[in-house]
Amino acid sequence: AVDKKNKMKFISKFLSVDNEGEVKTPTHGLHHFQWNHGEQKPRIHLRIDADDSGLLMINANRVFHLNPSATYMAYYALHHTPPQRAATQLARKFDFDKKALHQDYVNYEQSLVDLIDERACPICDLEIETTLPFSSTPCAPYRMDLALTYRCNNACSHCYNARPRSFPELSAEEWHKIIDHLWDLGIPHIVFTGGEPTLRNDLPDLIRHAEKNGQITGLNTNGRKLADPSFVESLVDAGLDHVQITLESHNPEIHDKMVVTPGAWQETIKGIRNALASKLYVMTNTTMLTHNHQSL
């Protein structure tokens, strides 16, 4: 059995119990939780829609669509609400038998822990009621990519950006407002892209602003500025969660030819190594063209 008192320690932007011990009713919108469990600190988002259905997202890469009763149980369980109090609230909301709800909630808590720990299949092993993906239209996207700039320190001929490199950029204050608006819309995951987003000197500030909201943040980059370990450290300290680095080939000549920048491969490789040495989740991206397909 799982020791929930030691295990389920959540930091939330919303409190479920007031000073008098009364459990608060779940509110529509986006709720953020961080579960501290040893070295693992899953980022959990619960989005409650206007019809009381919900979206449970774990680390921005696993998404579960919940019916209203499962959504409310998740809200109370993530706030570590005692079963007796949760059952009382659930009985009022859904007009179900309180005793049956009490046992359902206890089972649900355990299922939720197993789900977050990735110890169980959400379809085969768990009793959590979900709805099939694509069976309904979500109220908001799961993720939003933000093109911070169209400037770039590479010159790839295959670049898909339609904007000129000199296209005007938004200020940090304008991006703060956009990031806040995305949170208000219920979008828990944002990725900074470009152009080359690391050319923005205020990138750590933008990451930090999103982190304060509770959003998961990622970065799409050619990795060259990550060759500076102190720059990587500044992004990690700001709260960056993951990075995707474009590497066109293991062959320096092929890579540099594709990005039309001599010496770029060396910096990108250093950037990848520095990212791997950090707490970031790291991915690489490769564009398959006639220049490199035979060496992939």
Predicted regions and their residues:
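Short, electropositive alpha-helical surface patch
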Residues: R208-A210, L247, H293-L296
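Short glycine-enriched, charge-decorated loop/helix-capping segments at active-site entrances
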Residues: R62, R163-S166, K257-P262
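Conserved alpha-helical substructure of the radical SAM core
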Residues: K93, N107, D125-H242
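Conserved radical SAM core fold
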Residues: P197-L199, G223-L226, D241, I245-T261, ...
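Short acidic, glycine/proline-enriched helix-loop-strand junctions
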Residues: R200-D202, L206-N222, E253-E267, G271-N274, ...
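Acidic, low-complexity/disordered tracts enriched in E/D and polar residues
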Residues: V2-Y75
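Conserved strand-turn element in the central/C-terminal portion of the radical SAM core barrel
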Residues: G271-S295
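Long, charge-rich, low-complexity alpha-helical segments
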Residues: D3-D18, R62-D145
